[in-house]
């Protein structure tokens, strides 16, 4: 509303009819009308077929959101407990690897000995993790603007030859999986389903975005604990859950615009990502996928 010259205002008391409420309602309608006119104006730059396609996709996505996904709450709770137990076990192991640091304390005035300061290792403290792992030979390749080591999945993997770093990495993975499954359980409605939101054209690239919770981030089956996490999603008795994946949509669109017979033939008869890997001299197929999609979506522009 502010961008279109119609400040929406604010009104919170709807206990009884008032002039302020009426004014708020009128302004709300004016804002909605202004937004509609602006959208109609913006739509003029798109082909009618594009607009129709977006609306058809949104209808399907909305139906998906309404239907929701059945979550096996018993299995999800058991999985949460397993992850939590694993985190506690690793925490205990790390506290044995890194004994408490004891610092003597003395009174500044009397110089009398005070109770020692005891710092028990906390795997949740990135600063403690960095300091303790450095004593075991870890080297940090990235630093924060303030000069402190960046402790994350990437830098821990670089130090995975250090047993203690590998333990911390496993802890963070379990912590992440626990948070994911817990978010599903917290989102379950009375019908036993999770109704995650999908914005069909939410990203600047035109791709979909997901929230409350992000259903697109359910771990892949080949990733650590991915199979267990995916097993939490099910269907009512008597139904079957069918999975499928579209193959190379962006590359098929690229083939359309390139109109190159050789590229199209490779796309349809071979593994295009392996071919790109060889052509670009990359080490792995996933690197080739990252490269081509980064290029197509404008990385480096």
Q: Residue spans of the language-model regions?
A:
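Conserved "right-hand" nucleotidyltransferase catalytic core of DNA-directed polymerases
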Residues: 3, 7-8, 19-225, 234, ...
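Short acidic alpha-helix initiation/capping motifs at coil-to-helix transition points
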Residues: 55, 123, 267-269, 295-299
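Short, intrinsically disordered, charge-balanced linker/junction segments flanking boundaries
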Residues: 2, 298-301
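Short, amphipathic alpha-helical "recognition" segments used to contact nucleic acids or chromatin
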Residues: 63, 287-298
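Metal-dependent catalytic core segments for phosphate chemistry
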Residues: 243, 250-281
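Short, leucine-enriched amphipathic alpha-helices that occur as contiguous helical runs
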Residues: 54-57, 285-289
């Amino acid at each position: 509303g502010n961008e279109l010259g119609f400040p929406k205002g604010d009104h919170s008391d709807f206990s009884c009819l008032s002039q302020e409420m009426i004014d708020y309602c009128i302004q709300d309608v004016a804002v909605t009308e202004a937004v509609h006119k602006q959208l109609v104006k913006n739509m003029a730059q798109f082909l009618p077929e594009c607009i129709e396609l977006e609306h058809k996709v949104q209808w399907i996505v909305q139906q998906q959101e309404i239907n929701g996904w059945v979550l096996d709450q018993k299995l999800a709770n058991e999985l949460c407990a397993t992850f939590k137990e694993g985190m506690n076990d690793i925490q205990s192991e790390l506290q044995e690897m890194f004994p408490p640091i004891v610092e003597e304390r003395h009174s500044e005035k009397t110089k009398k000995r005070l109770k020692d300061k005891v710092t028990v290792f906390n795997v949740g403290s990135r600063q403690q993790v960095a300091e303790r792992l450095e004593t075991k030979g870890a080297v940090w390749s990235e630093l924060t603007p303030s000069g402190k080591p960046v402790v994350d999945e990437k830098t821990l993997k670089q130090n995975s030859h250090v047993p203690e770093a590998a333990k911390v990495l496993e802890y963070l993975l379990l912590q992440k999986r626990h948070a994911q499954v817990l978010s599903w359980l917290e989102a379950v409605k009375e019908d036993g389903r999770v109704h995650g939101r999908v914005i069909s054209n939410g990203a600047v690239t035109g791709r979909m975005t997901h929230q409350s919770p992000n259903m697109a981030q359910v771990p892949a089956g080949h990733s650590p604990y991915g199979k267990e996490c995916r097993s939490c999603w099910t269907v009512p008795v008597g139904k079957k859950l069918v999975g499928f994946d579209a193959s190379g949509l962006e590359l098929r669109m690229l083939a359309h615009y390139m109109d190159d017979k050789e590229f199209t033939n490779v796309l349809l008869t071979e593994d295009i990502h392996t071919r790109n890997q060889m052509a670009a001299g990359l080490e792995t197929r996933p690197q080739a996928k990252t490269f081509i999609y980064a290029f197509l979506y404008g990385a480096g522009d």
